[in-house]
A protein has these predicted regions:
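PLP-dependent enzyme catalytic core of the Aspartate aminotransferase-like
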Residues: 455-489
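N-terminal entrance/gating region of PLP-dependent enzymes' catalytic architecture
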Residues: 15-163, 444, 448, 459, ...
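Conserved PLP-enzyme active-site core in the AAT-like
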Residues: 174-336
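Conserved PLP-binding catalytic core of the aspartate aminotransferase-like
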Residues: 414-442
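Short loop-beta-helix segment that forms the pyridoxal 5′-phosphate
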Residues: 147-181, 222-225
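Short Gly/Ser/Thr- and Asp/Glu-enriched loop/turn motifs at secondary-structure junctions
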Residues: 161-163, 417-422, 454-460
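Active-site C-terminal subdomain of aminotransferase-like
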Residues: 304-408
Length: 489
């Protein structure tokens, strides 16, 4: 507790009771004026993003050198601040929304999502509990129940129908970390030695598995070999699990990738589920990218057996027209998640405790505070409708299939992995150096950006089609760029 002398120390300046603070804020008229200007600015950006070079031509430190060393003592005008969007910010923007962005996986966005984010920022609710944010809480659990149905997931994951439930996290990495923490807690409750727990993922699994396992206190992390199509080799998985058991260790957690980052390879969920069940393991499914495609029924066979997993994550902020951050995490039994994370100090007690209709999302993730992330997702699902979202996904897959066909029929090129959904991985038949040279030529064009990668010492180029503003003509332009540089003159 603070001592009385500390509390009585004089301040350099204390506002008087008559001091008016309203003049330090934007007035209603000013807010409207600058709000309209910024909407116009963003609208122009959306309409002309293809006119920019995909990646900026700057060096590390260039943007910082344009900024003052210290924060301003006196207020600057909004005119000055908005002008600096063009002068300072835009020269250093990597244009993830460019139609020629084919690198990594897409970073979803849309005008509707931006408007939802704008409203959420203005409302500035703190959604830690139902009592502090009833609308934010109930819109979130309703929208996530909608998604259970839209993606063909088990109805028992709906908050209103079963023991499961969903929550929006910052990223799939956070979801993976949580699943590991819950698994560890369940084993500790049973009396298991936490130092003996083992986590498993394929050699192609996302790096967040290793990071999450470290944070969750797992001492043993296994990388399971994959088959020729880059999915987990279940025979190898069984052998590794048996070896660990023979060594006195406890198999505790395994991840099935519903689309690996490198090649969108699919792990055999149903077969992995059988091994996990036999050994009492927590089974997590990471569908960060591919999960959005499950809105199209024809792609759901890619995650056959999903009803058997204990937790599942996907990112609307990748391929469902919703801007970062928005990652959905479902658990088959929400009581295990809440039991792991619930801490109730006196200052968080409230009159709705124990009411099943009053969800306190503070018990569903690590932070206490949380943003109104569901609002932009609610805007997107309502504004586009499932029909248009399916058209969006199917178009990208069709364009990827057409690009794949051109690669197959070009003797200079070859596929580096089977195509799944809208990611095409290919290489130059002259080998690794030629492949890297081709990737460099594409990226140097300024009109397209692809990701070079390597698996088992084989270099290849990833083309991920999924940007909000990409159209068929842009993919055809990319092919022309590949074709004109594949000769490697």
């Amino acid at each position: 507790m603070l001592s009385l002398p500390y509390l009585m120390r004089p301040s350099l300046h204390l506002p008087t009771m008559t001091e008016d603070l309203s003049n330090i804020h934007l007035s209603k008229a000013e807010f409207q004026e600058y709000g309209y200007r910024l909407v116009d600015w963003l609208a122009e950006y959306f309409d002309n993003v293809d006119q920019y070079q995909v990646l900026p031509s700057i060096e590390p430190g260039d943007i910082r050198n344009m900024l003052p060393v210290s924060a301003p003592e006196r207020a600057e005008t909004m005119d000055e601040i908005i002008d600096d969007l063009d002068r300072v910010v835009m020269p250093g923007v990597a244009h993830w929304q460019h139609p020629g962005w084919y690198a990594f996986f897409p970073s979803g966005a849309s005008p509707v999502s931006a408007l939802g984010e704008f409203v959420a920022a203005g409302l500035a609710t703190q959604g830690m509990m139902w009592s502090t944010a009833p609308a934010a809480t109930e819109i979130e659990n309703t929208v996530l129940d909608w998604l259970v149905d839209l993606l063909g997931l088990p109805s028992s994951w709906r908050l209103d129908e079963g023991p499961g439930g969903g929550v929006i996290q910052m990223s799939a990495s956070d979801s993976t970390h949580l699943s590991l923490a819950v698994a560890r807690h369940q084993f500790e409750l049973s009396g298991a030695d936490a130092n003996s727990l083992v986590a498993y993922g394929s050699s192609q699994a996302h790096s967040s598995i290793e990071k999450g396992a470290r944070i969750a206190g797992f001492k043993h992390i296994r990388s399971v070999p994959v088959t020729q199509t880059f999915g987990i080799d279940t025979d190898a998985f069984v052998r590794i699990v048996r070896d660990d058991i023979d060594s006195g260790l406890i198999p505790a957690w395994v991840c099935s990738a519903v689309g690996t980052t490198n090649t969108t390879a699919m792990d055999p969920i149903r077969a992995i589920a059988a091994i996990a069940s036999e050994n009492g393991m927590w089974h997590h499914a990471d569908a960060a990218y591919a999960g959005s495609a499950m809105i199209c029924p024809e792609f759901r066979e890619l995650q056959d057996g999903v009803e058997l997993v204990d937790s599942y994550t996907f990112n609307p902020h990748k391929w469902l027209l919703t801007n970062f951050d928005c990652s959905v995490f479902w658990v088959a039994d929400r009581s295990k998640l809440i039991e792991t994370l619930s801490i109730l100090p006196p200052y968080l007690r409230n009159e709705t405790e124990g009411n099943p209709a009053a969800i306190d999302y503070r018990d569903w993730h690590v932070p206490l505070g949380r943003r109104f992330r569901a609002l932009k997702l609610w805007f997107v699902l309502r504004s586009y409708g499932a029909e248009n979202l399916r058209t969006f996904i199917r178009s990208h897959v069709a364009w990827a299939e057409a690009l794949e066909s051109r690669i197959i029929n070009d003797s200079r090129l070859e596929l580096a992995a089977p195509r799944t959904l809208a990611l095409v991985c290919f290489r130059h038949t002259d080998g690794n150096d030629a492949t890297r040279e081709l990737a460099d030529a594409i990226n140097a064009s300024g009109s397209a950006y692809v990701t070079p990668s390597v698996t088992d010492d084989v270099a290849y180029i990833r083309v991920s089609i999924g940007s909000t503003w990409t159209e068929q003509r842009h993919v055809e332009d990319l092919w022309d760029l590949i074709d004109s540089n594949a000769g490697l003159k």
